[in-house]
Amino acid sequence: MAARNKQKKRAEPESDLCFAGKPMSVVESTIRWPHRYQSKKTKLQAPTKKPANKGGKKEDEEIIKQAKCHFDKALVDGVLINLNDDVYVTGLPGKLKFIAKVIELFEADDGVPYCRFRWYYRPEDTLIERFSHLVQPKRVFLSNDENDNPLTCIWSKVNIAKVPLPKITSRIEQRVIPPCDYYYDMKYEVPYLNFTSADDGSDASSSLSSDSALNCFENLHKDEKFLLDLYSGCGAMSTGFCMGASISGVKLITKWSVDINKFACDSLKLNHPETEVRNEAAEDFLALLKEWKRLCEKFSLVSSTEPVESISELEDEEVEENDDIDEASTGAELEPGEFEVEKFLGIMFGDPQGTGEKTLQLMVRWKGYNSSYDTWEPYSGLGNCKEKLKEYVIDGFKSHLLPLPGTVYTVCGGPPCQGISGYNRYRNNEAPLEDQKNQQLLVFLDIIDFLKPNYVLMENVVDLLRFSKGFLARHAVASFVAMNYQTRLGMMAAGSYGLPQLRNRVFLWAAQPSEKLPPYPLPTHEVAKKFNTPKEFKDLQVGRIQMEFLKLDNALTLADAISDLPPVTNYVANDVMDYNDAAPKTEFENFISLKRSETLLPAFGGDPTRRLFDHQPLVLGDDDLERVSYIPKQKGANYRDMPGVLVHNNKAEINPRFRAKLKSGKNVVPAYAISFIKGKSKKPFGRLWGDEIVNTVVTRAEPHNQCVIHPMQNRVLSVRENARLQGFPDCYKLCGTIKEKYIQVGNAVAVPVGVALGYAFGMASQGLTDDEPVIKLPFKYPECMQAKDQI
């Protein structure tokens, strides 16, 4: 790939390679390539380098060669090559030849014949790299990379066909590729490693499928677009995303969410009663969707488009034999031990009976019994309840109980990949996808392949790029491209969007061919930190390339976010309290503490009053609480300030002559604090300070090896204080134990990052963005969270 960006070594002149025909007219040449025909006077005054592309990098600039004349054709081995023909270009020894499009033929002012190439990339030369086998054979990508090369670099002509990028629908359509050596339907652009449609005339309206489910969906919900939040946690990403979309003018609703954590699901349901919250594993959710589609086809609610293998045990033939025998409708007397189904209440794919085998299950309300007798029953045993089943499926179809292919406009989610975490000492570097902890990435991709949404936003930790040379990121992009999705990759730091927290994360956009690929929102605030990202991916940090042109607000600090919160002790029993008339001291505090009715959040969720929720710290044991009391209330204080600690050459050790004791008789300075990173860390029992920016909000609050102690109070930061560092509105109440709430907040995508991405999505989905990979935000967080009718 690097070889394309350097001038090729000039080959020896060959008699069978030359320009053909007469030179083009001076007038036409100067109109088409004015930069090649600068006068000597102009050349002395003008820049000697070609300006970088808008949003591009300085290192992309190149010396502009001056021309005597231009040609529109050349002769290579007796074969005529015209402008815009595709050619093989002499490559490196032992390697495949390069592929390029000839976009200029000219004789330089020194008499040397040149051509200008626009390069094609094979899959293995792109971000896809080692996963080129996932992409269709003969498929190449036209890049935006261009440069001048001696005419002698041309090896031969090659036949490359441009074909339309097909719609992504649930219908099986045989794609017709004309006879060719290669074909392309996408462009590959190095900034943000974009794969975009090569069809510049795409029409967003053409993205609608002919599937009956989608047609029904569009008719019923013309003004609404539905979002599925996978691995949703407590809903931070989708909450911010929908608010951002709303600011852009798009009504996006989180219609479905899926997460395996019950407490996180409870939190999401409390704040978003409009959402169908599924507390189950993503792979079970996918199995359920396939069965749901089969049921909808069975009752002629959607047309059958392609075979979906049934996972249930009930065969259609058995049901057909009993079509006329429905105990619920015949009024026949029940046999002893039989019960009559009154109605179905729910559906899942699982094993509630504990048999060891997961199957399709329905929640049954039994006739003559109350809800305490409701049970999950396997679908295979409900063959005599066809009418009740049909009624349930029809009602579920109308209410969009579960998503069907074509009914989901956007999917967002962060598939957990603990197998790549830097905290995992047993990572599988050679084959990360063989690690069960990374399997959810494949499940996520399978769900996308089944539902075929218009847009996808995938989030993950930066280790996605750092681990094993970006193995999982490359696999994800290759999979999306193989499904014919456009993709764009970037990294965004929470602090860049109005939070006193660094927290850098990877975000991957994917969009259907006929949709506009969303850009990344440029930062609004300063972040004075260099992120530890691989050199290959450093330009994926959103705003890095454009930083010198941005006017950013000052970075927020911890005090800016939490100074108005009432003081609390180590133990707080109640998770609801008043603000105690404490007035917000900063703009951030003013807007983050708005009542729900004053924000862009759905008005019918959560608590409508202005109360303070979850301002509870993790309860420290007596020993740790006493240790915290030894930490001075000053900047940079930590366990090294405890009595009996000596520091030499930035390494802490115990004073052998003095060992302070706690009231319990244990040592004030625990051994784990001294041994952590061999005594060189300052994190154990570290006290935060008001003018600081927190590195990353984590899922636990123990102070043993991290800096989480409140600046002026002898306790760790509360759940609500952590939530503010993540940008949660104060009205967003959480469910579960205090430890569970810390986990939900720590796992969340920072809300303002979601807002910024939602706005970019909304603008792109309306066709209001250009082809640039970034967009400037017209607002700041959390001011943007205020509802328009409250301004």
Curated annotation (Swiss-Prot):
Outcome following mutation: T196I: In strain: cv. Kl-0
Molecular function GO labels: chromatin binding; DNA (cytosine-5-)-methyltransferase activity; DNA binding
GO process terms (BP): chromatin organization; DNA-mediated transformation; methylation
Disulfide bonds: none
CDD domains: BAH_plantDCM_I (cd04716), CD_CMT3_like (cd18635)
Domain SAM-dependent MTase C5-type: start-end pairs: 225-768
Source superkingdom: Eukaryota
InterPro entries given in the database record: BAH_dom, BAH_sf, C5-Methyltransferase, C5_MeTfrase, Chromo-like_dom_sf, Chromo/chromo_shadow_dom, Chromo_dom_subgr, Chromo_domain
Ranges for domain BAH: 79-199
Family, as annotated: Belongs to the class I-like SAM-binding methyltransferase superfamily. C5-methyltransferase family.
Name recorded for this polypeptide: Putative DNA (cytosine-5)-methyltransferase CMT1
